[in-house]
Amino acid sequence: SMLHHYYDILEKDRFEELYGDLYIGQHPTEERNSYLIIQLNFAVVNAELNNYRKSLDAHCNTVFNYFCDVYADYLPKGLKEGMNQKNGAVEQLDFLYRECEKNDLKIYLFIDEYDHFTNKILSEPACLEEYQSETHGTGYLRSFFDTVKAGTYSSIKRCFVTGVSPVTMDDLTSGFNIGTNYSTSPEFNELVGFTEEDVREMLDYYRTTAEFH
């Protein structure tokens, strides 16, 4: 993604190649190419409520190990081994951001389709009660975003989250009440979210295929 390459410390030698003829290339910010990137994609997480924790842990562990490998020249020795001794995504992310903080390293965390599996869970009425328990109180998903939030006071200096709807984020609000929803901002109305034209096209389509109630 554009943000990934703009902020990734590993891409600093390609900055002119990628952005030299663009406005952001001619007006660079101080933080360009100064971050270590963690990029999660929850679209690959199993949507079955009983299995999603295991799937989330597996995906995060794969990404965290990749992170340790590609940034090995910047990270302290033994970080990967120490991280893999922790149990699950929550403990591993907590370990990574704390160790990066000790070494004055900055993390940019990307989470794509953060609500992919929770939206599928919500489509099953029988799962609603379990979903609520996971996004409230001591639920695992809630704990994960609590950890992300805690990390923003440490080495996770930036976080960019994308999804289909704000439903899950609303349920996680008190656990992750540090974000800004750009999909409702007029300044970004053609960048994220649906335009009025998009909505009208969808309504016209479904009007011909299903009866509205």
Task: Give the location of each predicted region.
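Phosphate-binding site recognition
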Residues: 1-213
